[in-house]
Amino acid sequence: MSGTPDDGDIGLIIAVKRLAAAKTRLAPVFSAQTRENVVLAMLVDTLTAAAGVGSLRSITVITPDEAAAAAAAGLGADVLADPTPEDDPDPLNTAITAAERVVAEGASNIVVLQGDLPALQTQELAEAISAARHHRRSFVADRLGTGTAVLCAFGTALHPRFGPDSSARHRRSGAVELTGAWPGLRCDVDTPADLTAARQLGVGPATARAVAHR
């Protein structure tokens, strides 16, 4: 999902861990294989929604997972092999920073988006990015207010602080919290309750199919 400079001025990054290790808190409701399928489907729906945002110059997925890489490439995203060592103490932020170095070569404005937003609407992300333009660094908290759905950096480094209590960590790092409603953008899925909330909003077709085939 790379365009010309006229297509947009933002590089979007999505980091995806190995599918087999992802979303283990969904284990009570899905078999291991179905869980992997659901995680992949959520990525597909997230990418599909993001692709409609006109301000994006590129979409890059960084992942060590071959299936996730293939799905992202099939949707036109740029794919980076995640170089993060297995024993890295902070693998998500390490992966994001690695992607940032590459993406920053073509875009001075960078947005990190979670890849588990099956109810995301294109307009929500577009509106959040428009709001982010008023700040050097900003973020959108998840629906519970503790995590981070989006981190934006305009003309400056990301300094990602994803992980437990990332909303507070991003706030303490100087990022401005964006306060728009954007329910689909805020609804990342880690638990069965999160999935129920996303389904109530309306998930994308890939996730709907994956969830139906338990």
Swiss-Prot record:
<keyword id="KW-0808">Transferase</keyword>
<keyword id="KW-0342">GTP-binding</keyword>
<dbReference type="GO" id="GO:0005525">
    <property type="term" value="F:GTP binding"/>
</dbReference>
<comment type="pathway">
    <text>Cofactor biosynthesis; coenzyme F420 biosynthesis.</text>
</comment>
<protein>
    <recommendedName>
        <fullName>Phosphoenolpyruvate guanylyltransferase</fullName>
        <ecNumber>2.7.7.105</ecNumber>
    </recommendedName>
</protein>
<dbReference type="GO" id="GO:0043814">
    <property type="term" value="F:phospholactate guanylyltransferase activity"/>
</dbReference>
<dbReference type="Pfam" id="PF01983">
    <property type="entry name" value="CofC"/>
</dbReference>
<dbReference type="InterPro" id="IPR002835">
    <property type="entry name" value="CofC"/>
</dbReference>
<keyword id="KW-0547">Nucleotide-binding</keyword>
<feature type="binding site">
    <location>
        <position position="163"/>
    </location>
    <ligand>
        <name>phosphoenolpyruvate</name>
    </ligand>
</feature>
<comment type="function">
    <text>Guanylyltransferase that catalyzes the activation of phosphoenolpyruvate (PEP) as enolpyruvoyl-2-diphospho-5'-guanosine, via the condensation of PEP with GTP. It is involved in the biosynthesis of coenzyme F420, a hydride carrier cofactor.</text>
</comment>
<dbReference type="InterPro" id="IPR029044">
    <property type="entry name" value="Nucleotide-diphossugar_trans"/>
</dbReference>
<dbReference type="GO" id="GO:0052645">
    <property type="term" value="P:F420-0 metabolic process"/>
</dbReference>
<keyword id="KW-0548">Nucleotidyltransferase</keyword>
<feature type="binding site">
    <location>
        <position position="148"/>
    </location>
    <ligand>
        <name>phosphoenolpyruvate</name>
    </ligand>
</feature>
<comment type="similarity">
    <text>Belongs to the CofC family.</text>
</comment>
<feature type="binding site">
    <location>
        <position position="166"/>
    </location>
    <ligand>
        <name>phosphoenolpyruvate</name>
    </ligand>
</feature>
